[in-house]
Amino acid sequence: MTKQLKLSALFVALLASGTAVAGEASVQGYTVSGQSNEIVRNNYGECWKNAYFDKASQGRVECGDAVAAPEPEPEPEPAPAPVVVVEQAPQYVDETISLSAKTLFGFDKDSLRAEAQDNLKVLAQRLSRTNVQSVRVEGHTDFMGSDKYNQALSERRAYVVANNLVSNGVPVSRISAVGLGESQAQMTQVCEAEVAKLGAKVSKAKKREALIACIEPDRRVDVKIRSIVTRQVVPAHNHHQH
């Protein structure tokens, strides 16, 4: 009787433990220690599996039942942003050089004076520089004389100066010439007022002479130059003690 009770007690204990293991097994697929909550291993270090074990869904790497997921490939380095080269629009500088007709021509003439040749040669050297983009030669006259006559005279003078500059090395492709006659005469009213102040005692000839002298700035050739602004890169100087 006693032996049968002991066996019954052992059987109940086994059932109880089996129920507990089964409860754990349905979740883990392995026999799990109730105390440490870790998978139980045998003497060979192997994980104990139970009847509920499914290798495909429950296999563990530490038990040798699953392959560790490969390390994720590192994210590739982002490609550097392309370097955008912004072409800067060229900067221009405009300049006007006024040449007095008195230094270039005789009164009412369109042939260059001898001294004017030397001045134009120096100017041509400057206009031949590579940064010079365009040269516009404008002929101007004073208001005296007819519009038609002044227009023709201003054109002849502009062409004479332009041709001289070309003969001294200025590329013909960058130079142009135009006559503007008396259209930009600026001294007329001022000079007429000045001559009027001379009074009745001054002869007409003297007044005319004074007027011609006064309006001289209107008799001119303007050389209009457009150049590209060049940026000079100054090299750094190393200062050494000698």
UniProtKB/Swiss-Prot annotation:
Pfam families in alphabetical order: OmpA
Subcellular location, record wording: Cell outer membrane
Membrane topology: Multi-pass membrane protein
Record's protein name: Outer membrane protein class 4
Cysteine pairs bridged by disulfides in the record: C191-C214
Annotated source species: Neisseria meningitidis serogroup B (strain ATCC BAA-335 / MC58)
Sequence repeats: 69-70, 71-72, 73-74, 75-76, 77-78, 79-80, 81-82
GO biological process, one term: monoatomic ion transport
Main location: membrane
Biotechnological and industrial applications of this entry: Present in outer membrane vesicle blebs which are used as vaccines in human.
Domain OmpA-like: 92-229
Position of the signal peptide: 1-22
GO cellular component, one term: cell outer membrane
Phenotype of the disrupted gene, per the record: No visible phenotype when deleted in strains CCUG 37602 / M1080 / Serogroup B / Serotype 1 and 8765 / Serotype 15.
